[in-house]
């Protein structure tokens, strides 16, 4: 790292603080590997408060690895609906099937074997092995990188692989016997005290006595990230087509963005009224009346959809669509957030 700081005292400061201040979260009720794994996957790119309800609902429906491995894809997508990044849940099922086939349904304990499972990267493997099996395997994510950047007053961009490697190596050398608690304490500190958006709560930090960022008054300016590339903008026109109390849906392709999920019919580009009517006619339908129009935006990691939604009645339920009632859509169809925002009324 760019700065030198003795981290050997970090566990002794963090563990008592964590024991007193840790949040009561549903996935901390036990350390079953399946529960730790599920929570870590759900928490990727998703706020803790949003995950709580999904976690409980998912475990109620799929309480163990065998249930997950044999779950129907439509049911799985419906359980995940609203969490986004649906490749996570598809990989959960694939990994569960590997655990059933290769390990007889018993989650493996070896870091290398866990890392080899579909959808599990270095961070998640480290978290599972540390929390579930009490192994000294660092779980280095954005929270932990932010904490270390401030502790060490280090301006190295935290999104560079070499920065993550150095932090992982540093942490590997100071793990206490309470490995799982130390991993969670680092996560907790980054989530609640040493927070993002230039707003560390240094006065309440158990580590401020050893923190170079606090001592040098640089904590609020850290961490540093590489300049971001501009997100690509894409205009789309989305059709919410209705007929006799039913609505048109179709499946997205099995590969690519939002693979295999339901969507309202849509086309690239921002269509005016006549072009929109022509597009619906080209779908093999006969437009009757445009009910209303609306504007929505959805941001993915590397692309932003700027969407014009057109609510339109047609004469008959035709075309190559599935026509579902409102109840069927609510109970059965997993609509990703990009399209669900046109449905919520």
What is each PLM-predicted segment?
Residues 1-24, 29, 191-345:
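Intrinsically disordered, low-complexity, charged terminal extensions of DNA damage-control enzymes
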Residues 3-203, 207-216, 286:
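Catalytic cores of DNA base-excision repair glycosylases
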